[in-house]
Design a protein with these regions (language model features):
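ABC transporter nucleotide-binding domains
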Residues: 1-265, 269-589
Length: 589
């Protein structure tokens, strides 16, 4: 076998803290060869991102590092900052998790890409570097690349910003690419496009690639080899087929088992690698263990012909209307007692606007919202305040939703205090709430910062349950959680739905999660509901083209299926540009 592009031997990284030394990476070793894609997989805190920063030489100064890292036979730990700078962006490049933070907001995107070319190839003229930037933007699939090159990062969508980051990463044809959670913040369809693009770029360049991720579905379609990390150490490594079909370690099996499968019904999923963890969550659409038929159960929430239109204005001193944005455009649905309706769609489709219209309990611009049969526009201020105990919400980011200065007991008591509960009843209720969401009574005295992400989300659910609501709105409640933690939260929600008879409006863009918690699905696009039906009907026989697009974009944790779905999406002719790639290539002399 040829010499590896990247060799990591016995890498250890630690940081000082007020509680002692934190060992972020312990004795990690691996190699990546030319044209090979290695995925480093693990949950938050496993050390995977720290290991990639060590390779790039981007660790903070207080880090203690030992071991050895070689890139093309050169020992990185013996290099100074100047020598490392000549490698970054030229021989080795990185695609970061948050492109908006990685791109400079005050410079045009094209200029930032051109700068990467000229830093490593000063002989290239400014005009040629600018043309090269346009060629690269065209190669990664950005429409109207000449115009887009003159725009700023905030004028790009999230997917376009990540495409621009990939263009920057491949500008000098690096030997090594590191991608750190490149699709975490993206919708499922954009995620699929970005991963196809990254794989196409890697294969075109023949670059060695390290993908850092916690998403096993993404790994299946990208990696040749997989390295699994837990608590700073390597648990298992092997070929992608070996890891997915014949995992040796229990932790690897648990990671795979926790991944929801969008392609399998539960009867099939229970036989698969990924079926076991969610088997006890719910059969798809079987969370309705309520024996009464749906039509005979009372309606908890009814939305009829709802509209929310925002004017588009222009002008500084005198603003004039030049158009309108139909954020919600005539949608209708209802939720019955003990039922979970999933509202799914990409960013900008109107999901969050719909959620806010419901939670504000105010008269809509047009249409009607009824809670327990009562029109919200007919409510007095006092009646509206009382109704807020019937409709509660669990937010996407549990840390931002909980007051860090309040102990958990006070957080749970706050909504009860507003509704006039007695002290004795609140104390009893706090203990019951903690037990109901799988926490311990002693957790009541702790603060949010003392909990993990999954535990904080359980606190958020407990707070939503505090006043016996009829409906809980769940706004992307598991999107910020690791896959194993996500499975536990989903299991808890499904159990609460069955045990307490509470109804859910589950807002999400993750169809694989939705299948295992919802009874019915409403698919939104551009402010409209394009499909509404029972979960299994939508998954097995989607009627709308957009529903089929969403389903086809969901990553499936099966390498064989993922390989069949892979597409080459990079424009190779645009990448080479007029006169070939040498004008901006890392191989230029």
């Amino acid at each position: 076998m040829s010499e590896p592009i990247l060799s990591v031997r016995d890498l250890s990284v630690s940081f000082p803290s007020e509680y002692g030394t934190v060992h972020a990476v312990s004795n990690l070793s691996y190699e990546v060869h030319k044209g090979e894609a290695l995925a480093i997989v693990g949950e938050s805190g496993s050390g995977k991102s720290v290991s990639s920063l060590a390779v790039m030489g981007l660790l903070p100064r207080n880090a203690t590092v030992s071991g050895e890292i070689e890139l093309l036979g050169r020992k990185l730990f013996t290099m100074d900052d100047g020598q490392l700078s000549t490698l970054r962006g030229n021989t080795i490049s990185m695609v970061f998790q948050d492109p908006l933070s990685a791109l400079t907001p005050v410079f045009q995107v094209g200029k930032q890409i051109a700068e990467v070319v000229r830093i490593h190839h000063p002989e290239v003229s400014v005009s040629r570097a600018d043309r090269r930037a346009i060629e690269l933007l065209e190669a990664v699939g950005i429409p109207e690349p000449a115009r887009r090159a003159t725009q700023y990062p905030h004028e790009y969508s999230g997917g376009m910003r990540q495409r621009a980051m990939i263009a920057m990463a491949i500008a000098n044809e690096p030997e090594m690419i590191i991608a750190d959670e490149p699709t975490t913040a993206l919708d499922v369809t954009i995620q699929a496009q970005v991963m196809d693009l990254l794989k196409s770029a890697q294969e075109m360049l023949g670059a060695a690639t390290v993908l850092i991720t916690h998403d096993m579905g993404v790994v299946a379609g990208f990696a040749d080899r997989v390295l699994v990390m837990k608590d700073s150490q390597m648990v298992e490594t092997g070929g992608v087929d070996e890891i997915f079909y014949r995992p040796r370690e229990e932790y690897t099996r648990s990671l795979l088992a926790a991944v929801p499968r969008v392609d399998l019904a539960e009867s099939e999923g229970s036989k698969s690698i990924a079926g076991s963890a969610l088997r006890h969550v719910a059969d798809p659409a079987a969370g309705s263990t309520v024996s009464t038929p749906r039509e005979q159960r009372p309606t908890v929430l009814e939305v009829e012909d709802l509209h929310r239109i925002y004017p588009i204005t222009k002008g500084a001193l005198v603003r004039r209307k030049i158009g309108e944005q139909r954020a919600v455009d005539g949608i209708s649905f209802d939720i019955r007692e003990g039922e979970c309706l999933a509202l799914v769609g990409e960013s900008g489709c109107g999901k969050t606007t719909t959620l806010m219209e419901i939670m504000q309990l105010r008269a809509p611009q047009q249409g009607a919202i009824r809670v327990n049969g009562t029109e919200v526009q007919d409510l007095t201020r006092k009646e509206r305040a009382a109704l807020r105990s019937d409709v509660t919400i669990v937010f996407q980011d549990p840390m931002a939703a909980l007051d860090p200065r309040m102990p958990i007991a006070d957080i749970l008591k706050e909504p009860m205090r507003v509704q006039g509960y007695t002290k004795e009843r609140m104390d009893e209720r706090v203990e019951w709430l903690l037990k109901t969401v799988g926490l311990l009574p002693e957790h009541a005295a702790r603060f949010p910062t003392e909990f993990s992400g999954g535990q904080r989300q359980r606190v958020g659910v407990a707070r939503a349950l505090a006043c016996d609501p009829k409906l809980i709105v769940l706004d992307e409640p598991t999107s910020a959680l690791d896959v194993t933690v996500q499975a536990g939260v989903l299991a808890m929600l499904a159990d609460l739905k069955v045990r307490l008879g509470v109804s859910f409006l589950f807002v999400s863009h993750d169809l694989s999660v939705v299948r295992h918690i919802s009874d019915r699905i409403a698919v939104m696009r551009k402010g409209k509901i394009v499909e509404l039906g029972d979960t299994e009907d939508v998954f097995s026989d989607p009627q709308h083209e957009y529903s089929r697009e969403l389903l086809s974009a969901v990553p499936i944790p099966d390498p064989e299926i993922a390989r069949q779905r892979r597409r080459d999406v990079i424009d190779r002719s645009a990448f080479k540009g007029v006169g070939g790639a040498a004008a901006g290539a890392g191989t230029a002399s």
